[in-house]
Each structure stands twice: as structure tokens, then as C-alpha cells.
């Protein structure tokens, strides 16, 4: 679906297209990566986004390679608690601990509302191509440290055990700022506070419900 539906769109729709790809296309690489850096997708999801980008390369499309999302969009949408910041805050509150696998992996973080802001900012601009979109690069262990500052009762447990997600990369979003004048502004602390308020105030009855995890939600309906 991620690629073939985009192929149909590119072939049959000639107006403005805004496509949300992912920085996961970079996989695991050293250094600060920009849009000219080589790609190294490590999952079927990332590979499907690479293929979709290829289908759109000659269309009237702006393609955002999104960083790792965090935070809450509004009080009505389905909340995702399977994102690294959101799940660590939730675990800190409900279990009193954060389990960090390794912790030295880098992630380019991006608040979900900055995705909407970027789309609105560029929707009417006659700009096409691929653009990284993130706020700031963080190591996983530094994310955990920031959460413990908010929730001092929580403990960080680190383990050398290899995690199934081997992504590790930092990106630059300078191209987006130079060409479109947009820069993500919502910081990590804001997102931590949002998830903290959501969980601490028990606005979610069961934080372990499958609806709050994309993978679990799809598997419940037989989609893998």
C-alpha cells in the first residue's frame, strides 16, 4: 500500500502532492545526514517509502522525510504510545522505570504538530523535492534522562541486549529552512509534559490497549 498506491497517485494526479516519508530511509549511518546522503533502509516500511519517493520524483510533489514523532496532537485523535518518547514517559509513570536498550542510538525527533505546521507552511509554495523534517537529534539515553527530570521517581534501566530496531542516525533539516523558510519549533520538554498530563490525569483508561500501538492495532485485524 505504501508504494503501489503512491505509484497510482503519481500516474493519475497532476496537482500538488504532499507526501510523508521517513528519515528511517537512512537506516544506520554516521555523521549528519542530509537529503544527498545515501539511503540504507533497514525495514520493509522504510523500503516502501524509498520506492514511493522514486515514483514521485518527477511529479509536483514535496516529500517530507519525517523524524521520529512524539507528543500529542489533540484531545480527539488516536494517541500513539508506541513512539520512543511517548512510550518511555508512559512506562516511567505506570511502571516506575524506563528500559533503554543500549541508549547510544541517535534519533531525529519531531513533534507531531510540527508536521502539520510544515504542511501548512509549504502547501501553497511552488517547491518540490525531498526535505528532511526534524527538530533536534537526541540519543535515546538523553531522552530517558530528560524524562526522569520530569518524573524523578522513575529509574532508568540500561541493558546491552540488542534491540530489534537497529536504526541509528542524525539528520539536518537545513535545506527545508533555506528553501521553504520553515523550521520545527516544538521541543522535547513540551512533548514530555503533554504525555505526562495525558497519562497522569488518567485520560486513557488502559495505556496497554492495542489501539495505541500501530503494530498491535494492525495485528489485531490480521494485518502484518
Labelled PLM ranges:
Residues 11-17, 57-61, 124-128, 149-153:
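Short glycine/proline-enriched coil/turn segments at helix->beta-strand junctions
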Residues 26-27, 43-44, 65-83:
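Flexible, glycine-rich beta-alpha linker
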Residues 16-19, 62-68, 99, 108-109, ...:
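Structural signature of the Rossmann-like NAD(P)-dependent dehydrogenase/reductase core
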Residues 28-31, 40-67, 90-94:
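Active-site Tyr-X1-5-Lys
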Residues 95-96, 100-224:
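C-terminal substrate-binding subdomain of Rossmann-fold SDR/epimerase-dehydratase oxidoreductases
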Residues 51, 55, 84, 88, ...:
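Hydrophobic alpha-helix immediately C-terminal to the catalytic Tyr-X-X-X-Lys motif of short-chain
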Residues 7-44, 62:
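Conserved Rossmann-fold NAD(P)-dependent oxidoreductase catalytic core, especially the SDR/UDP-sugar
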Amino acid at each position: 500500500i505504501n508504494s503501489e498506491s503512491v505509484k497510482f497517485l503519481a500516474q493519475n494526479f497532476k496537482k500538488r502532492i504532499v507526501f510523508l516519508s521517513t528519515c528511517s530511509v537512512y537506516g544506520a549511518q554516521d555523521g549528519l545526514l542530509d537529503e544527498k546522503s545515501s539511503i540504507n533502509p533497514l525495514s520493509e516500511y522504510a523500503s516502501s517509502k524509498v520506492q514511493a519517493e522514486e515514483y514521485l520524483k518527477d511529479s509536483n510533489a514535496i516529500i517530507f522525510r519525517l523524524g521520529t514523532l512524539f507528543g500529542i496532537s489533540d484531545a480527539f485523535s488516536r494517541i500513539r504510545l508506541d513512539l520512543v518518547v511517548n512510550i518511555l514517559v508512559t512506562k516511567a509513570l505506570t511502571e516506575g522505570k524506563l528500559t533503554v536498550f543500549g541508549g547510544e542510538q541517535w534519533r531525529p525527533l519531531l513533534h507531531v504538530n510540527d508536521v502539520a505546521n510544515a504542511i501548512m507552511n509549504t502547501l501553497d509554495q511552488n517547491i518540490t523535492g525531498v526535505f528532511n523534517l526534524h527538530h533536534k537529534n537526541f540519543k535515546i539515553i538523553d531522552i530517558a534522562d530528560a524524562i526522569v527530570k520530569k518524573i524523578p521517581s522513575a529509574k532508568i534501566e540500561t541493558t546491552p541486549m540488542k534491540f530489534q530496531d537497529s536504526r541509528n542516525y542524525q539528520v539536518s533539516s537545513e535545506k527545508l529552512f533555506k528553501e521553504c523558510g520553515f523550521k520545527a519549533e516544538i521541543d522535547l520538554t513540551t512533548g514530555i509534559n503533554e504525555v505526562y498530563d495525558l497519562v497522569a490525569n488518567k485520560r486513557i483508561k488502559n495505556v496497554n490497549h492495542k489501539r495505541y500501538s500501530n503494530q498491535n492495532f494492525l495485528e489485531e485485524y490480521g494485518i502484518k
